[in-house]
From Swiss-Prot:
Organism: Penicillium chrysogenum
Gene encoding the protein: facA
Binding site for ATP: 404-406, 428-433, 519, 534, 545
Protein name: Acetyl-coenzyme A synthetase
Biological or metabolic pathway of the protein: Ketone degradation; acetoin degradation; Antibiotic biosynthesis; penicillin biosynthesis
UniProtKB keywords: Acetoin catabolism, ATP-binding, Ligase, Nucleotide-binding
Cellular component per GO, a single term: cytosol
Listed PANTHER family: ACETYL-COENZYME A SYNTHETASE (PTHR24095), ACETYL-COENZYME A SYNTHETASE 1 (PTHR24095:SF14)
Keyword ATP-binding in annotation: yes
Similarity comment text for this entry: Belongs to the ATP-dependent AMP-binding enzyme family.
Length: 669
C-alpha cells in the first residue's frame, strides 16, 4: 500500500555550505614550512578543544604559564561568571605587558628585528630591533612618568600608523598606565568625547600623518578637541612631517626633544593580572561610544595563543597585518600577538592602492612576509583592480588571513589562487573588539576550510545558536539564529569604562548565562559556523563597526533636520554602505543639503562614517508609537519593495510609496 507521495527533501537551513567546496591545507604549505605547525593535525585540535571546554582551568593555566612570563605566579585560574559579570583570570598573578612583548626577547637577542616600518613612501621605511625597541619604550615611559602619569591613569593616543604608535602602547603598559587609542581618522568631536570619557590627562599625537600620499592634520584635530578638554595638561607630539603646527606653550612638548633627556632603561612596573591594559571605544547601538576595557593577563594570553595557533607564528616569521592600531585588529594583531611571540611585525602606514595597486604585494616580496592579514574590503578593491598588479612570487606566504566581515566565496578563491598561488592556507577569522582575540577561526595549517565560513571555535570558546524569539538554545547542526557563547574565556572584555550596567545589558543580560555577540549565525551540517552579520543597529563598513544611532545623532545636529534614520545596505566594495533618510524642519530638498549632511557626519564622526547616499523625504515610516521602521527602508534600498511585509501598523502607510519614488528618482540621476 502506498504511503502517499514522497516528500521532497527539506532544503538546508545553512544553504551556503552546500554551494562551496571544502579546501584542505595545501601540500605546498607543509613543503615550505620551516619546522612544522604547533599542533599535528585536526585530531589534536579536537582533543585540545575538548580539554579546553571540559577542563578549562587546567587548560588555561597551562597555556598562560607556557606563553606568558609572570613576576608572581597565580593560584586561581578563573573566578566569576557571565551571570554576575565578574569574570577574572589568573587572579593572584603579577606581570608586565611591555616586559612580555619586548624585554624577554631583547635580553635573549637584542639585534632581532621587532618592527618593519613600511612608510607611506615606499623608500622611507626602517627596521627597529628588540634592543632598540626596549630603549625607545623605556625613554617614552620615563617621559610619561615625569609628566605625572601613574599606574591606572589613562593616556590618549591619536597617532598614524608609525612605529611610535607601537612604542606609545608599550610605554604606557611599562608603567601600568592604560592606553586609550583613538583612530587617527576620527574627527575632533569624536576624539574629544573619548578623551573626556576616559579622563585622559596626557595625549600622544604627531604633527601630521601621511596616508596614500595625503596629509592628515593630526595635531590640528587634537588642538580642536582640546578646546573642550581642560584637564589635559600634556600633549606629546612626534615630528612626522616637520610641518609648522599650532603650539600651546607649557602643554605641548616635542617627542624628540623630551625623550632625549631620559635614560635608556626603565624597569617595568609589575601589575596584577586583572589590572586594565587598555580602553578601546567601539560603536554601540545606543549611539554613545563605549570604552571597552581589557585587562592584562587574559588579553595577552588571547593574543599570544591565537597568534601561535591561528597564524602559526614561529620565531623567525615576518608577519604583516594591514589593520590600523586605532582598531582592535591593530591592537591585537599588529602590536601584541606578534611581539609577544617575538617575531617581526610590519607597521604599514600607507594604503593598498598607493603608489599603485601592487603595494601590498611589493611589501610581501620585499620582506619575505610569512603571514598576511587584511579585511575583505581591501581584497575586493584589489581583485577589482586587476590581476596584472600581481606579478610577484610571494612564495614566503604560509597564511592568508581575513578579518572584519565574512569573505565572499569568489574573493576567497581569488585570494587563494592569485595571491597565495594555491600554496598558503586561508584563515577567515571571526572575533570582536569585546572578545579581544579570535573566537571562531580555522587554525593555520590544520583546519579544512569552506569559503565564506569562519570554520570552528577556538580553544575555550563554546558557541551556542539561540532562537531570538524564544531565547532558547537551538541544538544540533544545520540551524541558524543569533550567536552567543556559553562559557567565559580569558581575553574577553571585563566591562565598559565607567558603565558596568551598560556592559551587562549589552552582552550578558540579553540571554542569561550567555555572552551575546550581536551577530546572527548559522551552524552547518558539519558544525562549521557561518556569520550572518549584525542583528542590532550597527553597520559594518570596510570591517569597521559604526553605530546607526551615532550617525543619526550627527545628522540631527544640522539645524535643518527634523528626523533621521540610517541603515546599512550591501555594497560591493565596502561590504555595507551607510545610507541616510532625513526629513527637514522646513523648506524643499536640494542637492546641496544632501552634500552638507554628508559633510556634517564627516566632521562629527570622521570621513569613514559619511553616508554614501542621503535621501531627503517628507516623512519617515513610523509605527503609531513613533518607532521608525528601519527594516522598511532597508528593503526599499535593496529593491525588495514587493516584500515589505505588513505596513498597516504604520501611522501613515502612504509615506512608503513616496520614499520609494524618492529613492528611484535619486538613482536615475
Amino acid at each position: 500500500m502506498s504511503d502517499g507521495p514522497i516528500q521532497p527533501p527539506k532544503p538546508a537551513v545553512v544553504h551556503e555550505a552546500h554551494e562551496v567546496d571544502t579546501f584542505h591545507v595545501p601540500k605546498a604549505f607543509h613543503d615550505k614550512h620551516p619546522s612544522g605547525t604547533h599542533i599535528k593535525d585536526i585530531e589534536e585540535y579536537k582533543k585540545l578543544y575538548e580539554e579546553s571546554i571540559k577542563s578549562p582551568d587546567t587548560f588555561w593555566a597551562r597555556m598562560a604559564r607556557e606563553l606568558l612570563t609572570f613576576d608572581k605566579d597565580f593560584e586561581t585560574t578563573h573566578h566569576g561568571s557571565f551571570e554576575n559579570g565578574d569574570n577574572a583570570w589568573f587572579v593572584e598573578g603579577r606581570l608586565n605587558a611591555s616586559f612580555n612583548c619586548v624585554d624577554r626577547h631583547a635580553l635573549k637577542n637584542p639585534d632581532k628585528v621587532a618592527i618593519i616600518y613600511e612608510a607611506d613612501e615606499p623608500n622611507e621605511g626602517r627596521k627597529i630591533t628588540y634592543g632598540e625597541l626596549m630603549r625607545e619604550v623605556s625613554r617614552v615611559a620615563w617621559t610619561l612618568k615625569e609628566r605625572g602619569v601613574k599606574k591606572g591613569d589613562t593616556v590618549g593616543i591619536y597617532l598614524p600608523m608609525i612605529p611610535e604608535a607601537v612604542i606609545a602602547f608599550l610605554a604606557c603598559s611599562r608603567i601600568g598606565a592604560v592606553h586609550s587609542v583613538v583612530f587617527a581618522g576620527f574627527s575632533s568631536d569624536s576624539l574629544r568625547d573619548r578623551v573626556l570619557d576616559a579622563s585622559s590627562k596626557v595625549i600622544i599625537t604627531s604633527d601630521e600623518g601621511k596616508r596614500g600620499g595625503k596629509i592628515i592634520g593630526t595635531k590640528k584635530i587634537v588642538d580642536e578637541a582640546m578646546k573642550q578638554c581642560p584637564d589635559v595638561h600634556t600633549v606629546l607630539v612626534y615630528k612626522r612631517t616637520g610641518a609648522e603646527v599650532p603650539w600651546t606653550a607649557g602643554r605641548d612638548i616635542w617627542w624628540h626633544e623630551e625623550v632625549e633627556k631620559y635614560p635608556n632603561y626603565l624597569a617595568p612596573e609589575s601589575v596584577s593580572s586583572e589590572d586594565p591594559l587598555f580602553l578601546l571605544y567601539t560603536s554601540g547601538s545606543t549611539g554613545k561610544p563605549k570604552g571597552v576595557m581589557h585587562t592584562t593577563a587574559g588579553y595577552l594570553l588571547g593574543a599570544a595563543m591565537t597568534g601561535k595557533y591561528v597564524f602559526d607564528i614561529h620565531d623567525d616569521d615576518r608577519y604583516f597585518c594591514g589593520g590600523d592600531v586605532g582598531w582592535i585588529t591593530g591592537h591585537t594583531y599588529v602590536v601584541y600577538a606578534p611581539l609577544l611571540l617575538g617575531c617581526a611585525t610590519v607597521v604599514f602606514e600607507s594604503t593598498p592602492a598607493y603608489p599603485n595597486f601592487s603595494r601590498y604585494w611589493d611589501v610581501i616580496d620585499k620582506h619575505d612576509v610569512t603571514q598576511f592579514y587584511v579585511a575583505p574590503t581591501a581584497l575586493r578593491l584589489l581583485k577589482r583592480a586587476g590581476d596584472e598588479h600581481i606579478h610577484h612570487k610571494m612564495h614566503s606566504l604560509r597564511i592568508l588571513g581575513s578579518v572584519g566581515e565574512p569573505i565572499a566565496a569568489e574573493v576567497w578563491k581569488w585570494y587563494f589562487e592569485c595571491v597565495g598561488k594555491e600554496e598558503a592556507h586561508i584563515c577567515d577569522t571571526y572575533w570582536q573588539t569585546e572578545t579581544g582575540s579570535h573566537v571562531i577561526t580555522p587554525l593555520g595549517g590544520i583546519t579544512p576550510t569552506k569559503p565564506g565560513s569562519a570554520s570552528l571555535p577556538f580553544f575555550g570558546i563554546e558557541p551556542a545558536i539561540i532562537d531570538p524569539v524564544s531565547g532558547e538554545e537551538i541544538v544540533g547542526n544545520d540551524v541558524e539564529g543569533v550567536l552567543a557563547f556559553k562559557q567565559p574565556w580569558p581575553s574577553m572584555a571585563r566591562t565598559v569604562w565607567g558603565a558596568h550596567k551598560r556592559y551587562m545589558d549589552t552582552y550578558l543580560n540579553v540571554y542569561k548565562g550567555y555572552y551575546f555577540t550581536g551577530d546572527g549565525a548559522g551552524r552547518d551540517h558539519d558544525g562549521y559556523y557561518w556569520i550572518r552579520g549584525r542583528v542590532d543597529d550597527v553597520v559594518n563598513v570596510s570591517g569597521h563597526r559604526l553605530s546607526t544611532a551615532e550617525i543619526e545623532a550627527a545628522l540631527l545636529e544640522h539645524p535643518s533636520v527634523a528626523e533621521a534614520a540610517v541603515v546599512g545596505i550591501a555594497d560591493e566594495l565596502t561590504g555595507q554602505a551607510v545610507n541616510a533618510f532625513v526629513s527637514l524642519k522646513e523648506g524643499k530638498p536640494t542637492e546641496q543639503i544632501s552634500k552638507d549632511l554628508a559633510m556634517q557626519v564627516r566632521k562629527s564622526i570622521g570621513p569613514f562614517a559619511a553616508p554614501k547616499a542621503v535621501f531627503v523625504v517628507d516623512d519617515l515610516p513610523k509605527t503609531r508609537s513613533g518607532k521608525i521602521m528601519r527594516r522598511i527602508l532597508r528593503k526599499i534600498l535593496s529593491g525588495e519593495e514587493d516584500s515589505l511585509g505588513d505596513t498597516s501598523t504604520l501611522s501613515d502607510p502612504s509615506v512608503v510609496d513616496k520614499i520609494i519614488e524618492t529613492v528611484h528618482s535619486a538613482r536615475q540621476k
